[in-house]
Curated annotation (Swiss-Prot):
GO terms for biological process: translation. Keywords: Plastid, Ribonucleoprotein, Ribosomal protein. This is Small ribosomal subunit protein uS9c. GO terms for molecular function: RNA binding; structural constituent of ribosome. It comes from Euglena longa. InterPro entries: Ribosomal_Su5_D2-typ_SF, Ribosomal_uS9, Ribosomal_uS9_bac/plastid, Ribosomal_uS9_CS, Ribsml_uS5_D2-typ_fold_subgr. Its main location: plastid. It is found in: Plastid. Belongs to the universal ribosomal protein uS9 family. GO terms for cellular component: plastid; small ribosomal subunit. It comes from the Eukaryota.
Length: 128
């Protein structure tokens, strides 16, 4: 039986994570699927707001694309935190904010400039 349903999007570098969060009652508790795989198979790093807040009664279905594993993990973390924010109490929301789960890291790849080989790598300078 499903009580609540939330959707959220998280971004980090080139990664985009779209999640669907379901509130459940004991049946199949705490299942997190990422692109059809279990979360612990897909990600090696555990940066999960559920573990941080000790919440167990939510099922999460995640579709993530682009970037590498760390960027995807950060995008998933942000998306889950945004979905949890919509129904948690203010005390727990403040806890999420204090530990940086709700802030988006806006740093991304710098663009290549003309006259240079990469974003900042210049050709070798010859004085004569």
């Amino acid at each position: 039986m499903i009580f609540k349903f939330f959707e959220a999007i998280g971004k980090r570098k080139c990664s985009i994570a779209k999640i669907s969060l379901f509130s459940t009652v004991k049946y199949n508790c705490g299942v997190i699927n990422i692109n059809g795989k279990h979360a612990y198979e897909y990600l090696q790093k555990n940066c999960n707001p559920f573990d941080f807040l000790k919440i167990k009664n939510y099922n999460v279905c995640i579709y993530v694309k682009g970037g590498g594993l760390i960027g995807q993990a950060e995008a998933i973390k942000l998306a889950i935190s945004r979905a949890l924010k919509s129904f948690l109490r203010k005390k727990k929301i403040k806890k999420l904010k204090d530990f940086g789960f709700l802030t988006r890291n806006s740093s991304c790849k710098e663009r290549r400039k003309y006259g240079l080989k990469k974003a900042r790598k210049a050709p070798q300078y010859s004085k004569r």
